[in-house]
Amino acid sequence: MEKHLITNDRVRHVPRQFSWVDHRLVRGNYLMKASAPAWALYLVLVTVGDEQGLSYYADRTLARLLSLHEESITEARRQLIEAGVIAYEAPLYQVLGLEPGGFERVEEVAS
């Protein structure tokens, strides 16, 4: 398929304060290691983190931003830690660099 712009007046440009989501989340099967709410939390952490992936948002704030209960933030954080994509030392989060190999494909998504 040949790609083309669908909407010319809204082309993305790299902003001065820039963060990225590593394509290895998909290609390395990381997405299968956590639930959708966990990946929503990850997206917020990637977006608000500094150049080293560090941020310190309170669970209450994260829950409000994501329309989740604080208990859901706790579970989402646990899943992301288990998936090896973040580290947490209250109140500090660190989005980690992804391992080159990723994971083998699994059948069941974490709940």
Regions found by a protein language model. Give the residues of each.
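Short recognition helix of helix-turn-helix/winged-helix DNA-binding domains
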Residues: 1-53
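Winged helix-turn-helix DNA-binding recognition segment
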Residues: 31, 37, 47-101
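Short, amphipathic alpha-helical interaction segments positioned at domain boundaries
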Residues: 100-111
